[in-house]
Design a protein with these regions (language model features):
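Short, surface-exposed beta-strand/loop "edge" segments at domain boundaries and coil↔beta transitions
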Residues: 32-35, 57-60, 102, 129, ...
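Structural alpha-beta junctions
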Residues: 13-15, 41-47, 146-155
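Acidic, proline/glycine-rich low-complexity IDRs
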Residues: 122-169
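N-terminal interaction modules that seed assembly of large macromolecular complexes
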Residues: 19-76
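Short, surface-exposed beta-edge/turn micro-motifs
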Residues: 45-47, 115-118, 125-128
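Surface-exposed, low-hydrophobicity interaction/linker segments
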Residues: 53-120
Length: 169
């Protein structure tokens, strides 16, 4: 039974089993290609990316330039954009493995029941939370954040997740 729980994304800790929901860490507040740096451990091209406009303020190198011009990107388009330098004020972006109906996901429960595989939330210019349905993807993001020297790296679990809404503002 333990093995099947682990395969479903469970982490054994003493007598309690915690589900790893994602990772959290702090990024530097500077103009850089931070989204690319975080996501390069993932096959970005295999996802469809949906930016939630009302929850996103990201600037390109020209201050008056909105970094993301569209709400929806195929993986190859998305990776070409995120390679450019940008400054994140706040961001909510959702990743899907297949093209489907896209909608703004408001709660963790909606995320679990949706076709969305990853939600990236950045707020206050430096705090990042990435939710993933796949534990191994969360581990990749955690290792990547540590390798980049990002601060306050940790896993988001059922036990420590205080977020009630998937929102950054």
């Amino acid at each position: 039974m333990f093995h099947s729980l682990w395969r479903l994304g469970m982490q054994w800790k003493g007598m309690v089993i915690y589900m790893i929901r994602g990772v959290r860490f702090k990024i530097p507040q500077k103009m850089d290609n931070i989204i690319f740096n975080i996501l390069c451990c993932l096959n970005v091209e295999s996802y469809y990316w949906f930016k939630i406009s009302s929850q996103t303020e990201v600037w390109g190198e020209q201050i008056e330039e909105d970094f993301f011009e569209k709400e929806f990107y195929k993986g190859d388009e998305f990776i070409n954009i995120i390679k450019n330098k940008h400054r994140i004020i706040f961001l909510k972006i959702q990743a899907y493995l297949k093209e489907c109906d896209l909608k703004n996901i408001h709660t963790y429960e909606e995320f679990v029941d949706s076709n969305c595989d990853i939600i990236i939330l950045v707020y206050d210019c430096e705090f990042v939370e990435i939710y993933s349905k796949n534990e191994s993807t969360s581990i990749l993001f955690f290792r990547r954040a540590k390798a980049l020297g990002y601060k306050s790296c940790g896993y988001i679990t059922d036990d420590n997740d205080s977020r009630t809404k998937m929102a950054v503002i």
